[in-house]
Amino acid sequence: MESLKQKILSEGIVLSDQVLKVDAFLNHQIDPALMQQIGHEFAQRFAGQGITKIVTIEASGIAPAVMAGLELGIPVIFARKFQSLTLKDDLLISKVFSFTKQTESTIAISARHLTAADKVLVIDDFLANGHAAKALIDLIQQAGAQVAGIGIVIEKSFQEGRNLLESEGYRVESLARVAALENGQVRFLD
């Protein structure tokens, strides 16, 4: 997606050969026009798949997921990284390791929002090692629902996430595929 790549080049900051900071438009401050384009792109890529729900993880996956949900006309569920007073009964629970934060979190979704009849699109802001996507897939499978595909805003193609997910038969659609982060520069795969 060319507009996303241009935004990464103009506003993204390479912090290391492993970390790309995109808080100017994606995971702190949000560019609504870009999110609308991202939602439209995901909707086009997954059109006609019979998708009934989108699942993401708080917080950075919410904006692109909501825009895709708006385009597809379906609800969005976000997994919470901690339990709250209102999210405590009949939960689907998994664990996820954050590459950026280097910590493990417990994530949860209320089981009443996801059923075996659902066909689910997973959307997240980044794909690195695939841990977040795998944790979301685990929640979806606990509900007996089907994973229709995985939509990623920015993929770090030099890490193993895509290979892990595709080796298990999942369709992965990434809007920007980063081949390398080197010398303060972003190099795209395609």
Curated annotation (Swiss-Prot):
Q: Name one GO biological process term.
A: XMP salvage
- Would I find Transferase among this entry's keywords? yes
The protein's GO terms of the molecular function aspect are: xanthine phosphoribosyltransferase activity
Give the organism the record lists. Answer: Ectopseudomonas mendocina (strain ymp)
Annotated positions binding 5-phospho-alpha-D-ribose 1-diphosphate: 128-132
Signal peptide location in the record? Answer: none
Catalyses which reaction? XMP + diphosphate = xanthine + 5-phospho-alpha-D-ribose 1-diphosphate
**The name this protein goes by in its record:** Xanthine phosphoribosyltransferase
Q: Which pathway does it serve?
A: Purine metabolism; XMP biosynthesis via salvage pathway; XMP from xanthine: step 1/1
- Report the EC number(s), separated by commas if there are several: 2.4.2.22
* Recorded GO CC terms: cytoplasm
**Subunit details:** Homodimer.
Task: Quote the Pfam families the UniProt record gives.
Answer: Pribosyltran (PF00156)
